[in-house]
Every structure is written in structure tokens, then in C-alpha cells.
Amino acid sequence: MAPKAEKKPASKAPAEKKPAAKKTSSSVDPSKKRTKARKETYSSYIYKVLKQTHPDTGISQKSMSILNSFVNDIFERIATESSKLAAYNKKSTISAREIQTAVRLILPGELAKHAVSEGTRAVTKYSSSTQA
């Protein structure tokens, strides 16, 4: 391996620093507080499903966080798999068929069957509501 070349000082003089442009006080209103960035979660939907199935049961913040992570993970897996399926078939659009196939590939046995039937039911319900 060749030895590294010796570093030589730069021949050019460093660029002159320009004075920073001053901000006018009218551009920033001090009375307005900066809003916190909103983090979107599935918490409200998880809670609604919980109340449909077990009306008298609550859920801790830690459990809600775990379920939210689970939903995000499954969503990402299905999206990735359906994207691959669309690419294999040389299509630029992910359709319901790609989603359904991805669900069948990712989820095991009976769980996949139930997920596909619920998904089909949801798509049918949505389609009928948009046509009316």
C-alpha cells in the first residue's frame, strides 16, 4: 500500500466572513409560542376497538405504546412486501390484490384468513359508501 501524501497548507486565503443579516422584530411574533411537533399514533383506534370487545377493561400507557409499535411494525411489513410484489409484476401501483397477497405471505395460517376476510369486508364497505 502506498504511503499517504503529506498534507500541505492551503494556498488560498480563507473566505472573508460576511456580517449576518439582522432579523427584524416584525418577522417573528414573540407572543406566539412554538407548537410541539405532533406524533401520530393508533392509540385512539386501539382504545375504540378495546371498548367494543371489552367495555369494562382499561389499558396502561405502556401497553398502548407496545400495541402502537406492533401496528406500525405490521403496517411497515405489509407495505414493504406489497411494494416488492408490485415491483415483481412491473406495476407502479399497489392495489388491494398486492396488499391481500402480502398479508397472506406475512401472517400465519388462520390469522391470514381472518385478516383477508376483514380487509375484504372493509374495502367493500368503503366502496359502497363512496358510490352512494
UniProtKB/Swiss-Prot annotation:
It comes from the Eukaryota. Pfam families: Histone. SMART domains: H2B. PROSITE patterns: HISTONE_H2B. Monoubiquitinated by the UBC2-BRE1 complex to form H2BK123ub1. H2BK123ub1 gives a specific tag for epigenetic transcriptional activation and is also prerequisite for H3K4me and H3K79me formation. H2BK123ub1 also modulates the formation of double-strand breaks during meiosis and is a prerequisite for DNA-damage checkpoint activation. SUPFAM superfamilies: Histone-fold (SSF47113). This is Histone H2B.2. It comes from Kluyveromyces lactis (strain ATCC 8585 / CBS 2359 / DSM 70799 / NBRC 1267 / NRRL Y-1140 / WM37) (Yeast).
